[in-house]
Amino acid sequence: MTKVVNNLQDIFLNGARKNRIPVTIYLTNGFQLKGFVKGFDNFTVILDSDGKQMMIYKHAISTINPAKPLLFVQNPNGDDYKDKE
């Protein structure tokens, strides 16, 4: 059974992950992390940066900025989202 993505946070992170779009993650303490989203759950994001993986707690994230816009449309079967471009 396929999990239906139903909130903007999951749609955004899943789009960045599936389309391998580089992101810059700004933390609440001012640090910037650049890399690719490899996975996420309700509390964390896994970021691949220069071949190293980091687990970042979502409560420490201020902003996530993708290298290119993520525009989403729902597939006709209703179980996935993909980049519109």
Swiss-Prot record:
GO terms for molecular function: RNA binding. SUPFAM superfamilies: Sm-like ribonucleoproteins. Keywords: RNA-binding, Stress response. The keyword RNA-binding applies. The keyword RNA-binding applies. InterPro entries: Hfq, LSM_dom_sf, Sm. Residues 10-70 form the Sm domain. Belongs to the Hfq family. Homohexamer. RNA chaperone that binds small regulatory RNA (sRNAs) and mRNAs to facilitate mRNA translational regulation in response to envelope stress, environmental stress and changes in metabolite concentrations. Also binds with high specificity to tRNAs. This is RNA-binding protein Hfq. It comes from Clostridium botulinum (strain Hall / ATCC 3502 / NCTC 13319 / Type A). The lineage of its organism: Bacteria, Bacillati, Bacillota, Clostridia, Eubacteriales.
